[in-house]
Amino acid sequence: MTADPPPPARHAARAGSFDAVAAQYAANRPSYPPALLDAVEELAGRPLSGAKAVDVGAGTGIASTLLHARGADVLAVEPGAGMAAEFRRALPHIPLVRGNGNALPLADATADLITYAQAWHWTDPARSVPEALRVLRPDGALALWWNTNALDVDWIAEAAGRAGRFLGIDIAAEQRKAGERVEQADPSGRLDFTRRTVRWSRRVPIGTHLANIATHSALLITPEERTAAFLEQERAHLLEVFPDGMVEETYDVLLIVARTP
């Protein structure tokens, strides 16, 4: 069956679950392809080089690293203590402030670009949209994106089915609902989002793939013994598909960008 949205306490538990695994998250989560940054520049109507970019929900700095490499002047905003500590350890050259998108600790009209990589769904758009508009300069842009599983790839669809049965959810339906939520990222209708999808893949050892899975919030709040058993079963399934121990992960990055009205 399809899971209902988590109640507030469960949502909060999932949102805060990453701090304890920040180093594992940084080491194993996928990054994003250069084509995504190209699309952000195109839809934002300006180059990243020289842009004042605020990366909200920056986590361990996966997106901040890419923005900085493109020449953006990046300020990271991260609510979690563990994630912020890992960010500062790995990226001491990029400033970070503690905070969240519902109440940005920033002055008005100070950013050319605000980004949320894999993070907008942890905010309340009734608060985070006005906050983004407050902080963005005229002609600024808000860019939101998510790595999503390419469920048209057979082995990925099969793995999603197994994970869904373990967690008691329909992952394919949840991913479709996520797409709908992206289209409704601003319930107030103040922003006009343009949508783009970028497909990419990476080839990683099975251990990296499993460690990545283990950093997802639904598993992080599952009892450790159950999660460990599930991951061992997954290892066996994956070795049947990838006998050399190298997994070809395929992602569709779902990107939406809106310029300030």
Regions found by a protein language model. Give the residues of each.
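Nucleotide donor/acceptor-binding cores
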Residues: 50-51, 109
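Conserved Class I S-adenosyl-L-methionine
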Residues: 180-261
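Conserved catalytic/acceptor-binding region of the Class I
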Residues: 127-203
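A short acidic, Gly/Pro-enriched loop at the edge of an enzyme's catalytic core
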Residues: 102-114
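Conserved class I S-adenosyl-L-methionine
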Residues: 1-49, 83
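A short SAM/SAH-binding and catalytic strip from SAM-dependent methyltransferases
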Residues: 112-126
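Class I SAM-dependent methyltransferase SAM/SAH-binding core
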Residues: 52-54, 59-103
